Amino acid sequence: MGARASILSGGKLDEWEKIQLRPGGKKRYKMKHLIWASRELERFALDPGLLETSEGCQKIIRQLQPSLQTGSEELKSLFNTVAVLYYVHQRAGVTDTKEALDKLEEEQNKSQQKTQQAAADKGVSQNYPIVQNLQGQMVHQSLSPRTLNAWVKVIEEKAFSPEVIPMFSALSEGATPTDLNTMLNTVGGHQAAMQMLKDTINEEAAEWDRLHPVHAGPAPPGQMREPRGSDIAGTTSTLQEQIQWMTGNPPVPVGDIYKRWIILGLNKIVRMYSPVSILDIKQGPKEPFRDYVDRFFKVLRAEQASQDVKGWMTDTLLVQNANPDCKTILKALGTGATLEEMMTACQGVGGPSHKARVLAEAMSQANSAIMMQKSNFKGQRRVVKCFNCGKEGHIARNCRAPRKKGCWKCGREGHQMKDCTERQANFFRENLAFQQGEARKFPSEQTRANSPTSRELRVQRGDNPLSEAGAERRGTVPSLSFPQITLWQRPLVTIKIGGQIKEALLDTGADDTVLEDINLPGKWKPKMIGGIGGFIKVKQYDNILIEICGHKAIGTVLVGPTPVNIIGRNMLTQIGCTLNFPVSPIETVPVKLKPGMDGPKVKQWPLTEEKIKALTEICLEMEKEGKISKIGPENPYNTPVFAIKKKDSSKWRKLVDFKELNKRTQDFWEVQLGIPHPAGLKKKKSVTVLDVGDAYFSVPLDKDFKKYTAFTIPSVNNETPGIRYQYNVLPQGWKGSPAIFQCSMTKILEPFRMKNPDIVIYQYMDDLYVGSDLEIGQHRTKIEELREHLLRWGFTTPDKKHQKEPPFLWMGHELHPDKWTVQPIQLPNKDSWTVNDIQKLVGKLNWASQIYPGIKVRPLCKLLRGAKALTDIVPLTAEAELELAKNREILREPVHGVYYDPSKDLIAEIQKQGDGQWTYQIYQNPFKNLKTGKYAKVRSAHTNDVKQLTEAVQKIALESIVIWGKRSPKFKLPILKETWDTWWTDYWQATWIPEWEFVNTPPLVKLWYQLETEPIAGADTFYVDGASNRETKKGKAGYVTDKGKQKVVSLTETTNQKAELQAIYLALQDSGSEVNIVTDSQYALGIIQAQPDKSESEIVNQIIEQLIQKERVYLSWVPAHKGIGGNEQVDKLVSAGVRKILFLDGIDKAQEEHEKYHNNWRAMASDFNLPPIVAKEIVASCDKCQLKGEAMHGQVDCSPGIWQLDCTHLEGKVILVAVHVASEYIEAEVIPAETGQETAYFILKLAGRWPVKIIHTDNGSNFTSAAVKASCWWAGIQQEFGIPYNPQSQGVVESINKELKKIIGQVRDQAEHLKTAVQMAVFIHNFKRKGGIGGYSAGERIIDIISTDIQTRELQKQITKIQNFRVYYRDSRNPVWKGPAKLLWKGEGAVVIQDNSEIKIVPRRKAKIIRDYGKQMAVDDCVAGRQDED
């Protein structure tokens, strides 16, 4: 104590004792205050010796000041004492504590201003300064509401236009990742954009982690860890860590890095919202240059390019894409002109006044030489000739005509003029121009079908140029009687004018007809017209005759130096020429991916060199035909491609594995439910079978879906990058191709069908059956019409597959004029059969059974039972070999079917083959079958012949409706009418009874026994029951009679169901010829009441034998465990020592069913005899039953104590919302401001009403404030923060926000103030909206959840003995044994355990229960543990 008295000495101590504790107070500082201060400093781990100097006091002040806001009163007193002592050392002459504190604050403010001024002098932005306070610490200043408001306004007003990026860059200058996340959180409502941004951030973070791997071993002491990608994104790093990284030595600018990632994502978003390319920005003819510049730079900002590239775009594209008037002026300025000089020079260009000035200037320059006639008008003839347009007077470099594709010498594409081998320039080839008025050759129909639109010029004959266009729009086929010129190349035609042949361009955009280098008769007058690149002077000739494509027109012709001869509208209208934009012949079907899914991104696997070579050749050919097209790296999708050899050929076939794309593509409705059958065909005089070539490749694919079909042809040893393609047509192997093709083909055939109603066309995929009653010549004419019709739509019908003469091969059948059969079937002879061989064999026999009666396959199918590999060898049983030999014999002689006659009735005859197999024939005339078939399906393990016969009848009736459209044929059945009627009346549930007659075809079907419908008077009554233990498989079966007789037998390796059946068998054995049997087993009752005569179960077959021997049997059912006399007695009799009555017996089944159906707790408690507490716990632990929808990454924690908090905005005010995650119960209120103080007060109110364990919030400044942290600490609440833009984080409260606003909108007119409407909406949501689990309201649900939680905890406390056990367990995703966990309940099916604080239900088969041996477990060899294992 004495040592500390030396802090002040002499005059300083006297000055110390003069200072007042409070202004105007009587108490003054004493020596005891110094001694107390030194002791307090030791408590705070500070050196008391620091009090002896002013520098030491300053260090103490720096250390204590950050803790003042949350510190205790003792801490504040200590700070005040040290501050006064600091000024005593300084001899500042303070009079009281307040004066010392005011001086200290003033001094600190001056220091901070100096720091800020120094930073400003250095040119560093101070938007979000990380400044050094008086204590030398780096302190972060949070974003201001004004900055956030400016950012929100930018997004709302600009809607992700290019201006957003520079604005974001300016507002976020110097920001930390936490600041950036705060900015993004404020615009989180733009979910699509934020999802794109999140994807970009994740990709960049992963790339950062890849380029900056974690160093092995622990970090050196005192050194900060290196930031990971998630640290930079602010999700796994704290604000303090970010500040240390940004201000460290050397610094890691995590804020700038994260900002760069966000700007990359914003670029992608801007490109999506503003999809205009800089190349598309061109100045309009009359658009002011200033407006053009504004548009240009707006799009330039959105371009993802470096500054150098953007500079090049400004220098070149700005001038290049200007209109001709401005371009002339800009080129005159030179390359060094600034933007201001350009805008000044082009001011006013493009308006009417500018046009007038130019025209006047041009006219003033017209001299007498221009007005001279004929040859004087032309200048001196030049010898140079243009390779581009073929005209003399200029070279190709200066040509103003559009650039021609291909070689300038020969006109062919694929090489340049310097590489051309032709000697003579022949660009205007003869096949490109009309000759003698005929249309030039245009692209094939298939190419047009593959194009999105087919634009063409038509020269019409007739007075109504619109009639044909209208007819085409109605769906009829356009007539080809007049020339058509498609616009895939320039519409150049040959014209005749003044006896001279010229080539000219048909230009629907030109008013006048302008020709070059031609002498015309008659007088002319001078004229100036605006042309390409400026004004040209021309001679105007009137009433000139021109012949175009065989059509004559008279009108004005202008002659002058035009780059290309033009036929304008003044001539085109006279000959009826129209510009048509017909829709593509085949309308594309729009296709989308399944909601929430993206396209496939499957890597291409390696391929051999020969496969790569084959695929390259195939794709080159397909690309030429327009079926696929090359794509660049901008397409992120890929599907693997491979090649296989064609059957019996050395050629290769390309296959694309669309498995992943098929999973992601929307579902399609199958437009054709099955394949047509020849038995349903009507007999026709003439028949033709056609095949559509390249069927799928003739139908265009939706342009927006093409990108998802991308695939890559790799190179050997990665010599070059892979060649990327995407499909333009329907791909083979894609799930949508069949449905879209069938739909398209139906639409195409519809006009032909309507025009030719007497012709029958059966269409299945690319196979067409065409039948008619026309003579063969007329029929073939119609076939050619059909082929021509299909060709116009782009579908070819190759001659190779055009079948004109019988027999016709169609759909696997062979068609003759008056009969049909299946194509020849050869059954293989093998010494050994694999599973795959037998599968193919059964398939062939099933196919043959449609016309070959008597074929049986059941013995062969029995060989395939069990899980076997395709290559496993299967020995044939004697039964199977016999059936195979019989089937060979049946197939030896060919059998034919006949065609359907609509005027006659159908007859179906069924025969029993034995062993559960049936065969049938459908015919109209005896011995002339339309088709045959077989039935051998066993729908249940216990059946009888009558039941199988009725199932066969049902199958044939359905088949009749499908093939012939008839409800039912007349049946001939091998069963007595009395037997049939008995079964039909009692057991067959149907709305119709087929017409049938008895056929005495052995073996006949009969019922072997019949159960009574009423109890038998005078007969003994047997109460039967059975029980078994699931673990030991031991059980008992027995009965008790109404006369006191009883019997029990012990069973091994049994189940409850088998024991119940065994009890019935005992009763039948020990009873007389008449007996009443009562059981409580619905399973046993259902089997026996169906009156089976055969079964796969041995015990059921034994029961059937006993039933056949009885005269009369009555079987009844009573509910179990309801106190019914005889049933209760026999239940006790068989349960003794067998059943363990534990309520958790059914918990595993309940869990499995809940995982499938998500039923509520009441249903599980009822169905599985579970206590409500356990059933509710199963529901409570299922996150799918607590949330609407499912989180994209993981599941939301639905424990009873978790709440999510968020602020939402409405009518300019802030609504703070808290939602109980498990029940969706909400608390909400309008708060004055979005501050930490208001939020902390709300949290304390919430904690005072409900048990709050965890609150989950976003990273908003109010939630991260010290006030909220303090209130959470005081109330014992754990606070968790969400990951920005992760739907898992705040999904529940976000959806509740939307729901709350919706309800507020419904009641807003009933309340004057918003805060009233909010409370009304909360009441409605919590207590007036029911649904979800148990049909509860949210208020009822939260009370129920909390009550259940309390009951469960109290119930656990009562279990004492069982807690002496420990459980080791495994969960489904991890094979490692976990534990030990505490055992709470044990049942036969599952156990309830507690692992740490989490209660889990684990299936019994995944748990090991052992005694708690304490420390001995660690050293013993666990022998005793294995002995005690349950």
Curated annotation (Swiss-Prot):
Region described as Interaction with membrane phosphatidylinositol 4,5-bisphosphate and RNA: 14-33
Superkingdom classification of source: Viruses
Segments for region (Disordered): 438-475
Bias kind Polar residues: ranges: 444-454
Motif Tryptophan repeat motif positions after renumbering to this chain: 980-996
Cofactors, names only: Mg(2+)
Keyword Ubl conjugation: no
Location of the region described as Interaction with host CALM1 in the Swiss-Prot/TrEMBL record: 8-43
Region of interest (Interaction with human PPIA/CYPA and NUP153), residue spans: 185-223
GO cellular component, one term: host cell nucleus
Ranges for domain Reverse transcriptase: 625-815
Motif (Nuclear export signal): 16-22
Catalytic activity from the UniProt record: Specific for a P1 residue that is hydrophobic, and P1' variable, but often Pro; Endohydrolysis of RNA in RNA/DNA hybrids. Three different cleavage modes: 1. sequence-specific internal cleavage of RNA. Human immunodeficiency virus type 1 and Moloney murine leukemia virus enzymes prefer to cleave the RNA strand one nucleotide away from the RNA-DNA junction. 2. RNA 5'-end directed cleavage 13-19 nucleotides from the RNA end. 3. DNA 3'-end directed cleavage 15-20 nucleotides away from the primer terminus; 3'-end directed exonucleolytic cleavage of viral RNA-DNA hybrid; DNA(n) + a 2'-deoxyribonucleoside 5'-triphosphate = DNA(n+1) + diphosphate
Additional observations: HIV-1 lineages are divided in three main groups, M (for Major), O (for Outlier), and N (for New, or Non-M, Non-O). The vast majority of strains found worldwide belong to the group M. Group O seems to be endemic to and largely confined to Cameroon and neighboring countries in West Central Africa, where these viruses represent a small minority of HIV-1 strains. The group N is represented by a limited number of isolates from Cameroonian persons. The group M is further subdivided in 9 clades or subtypes (A to D, F to H, J and K).
Protein name: Gag-Pol polyprotein
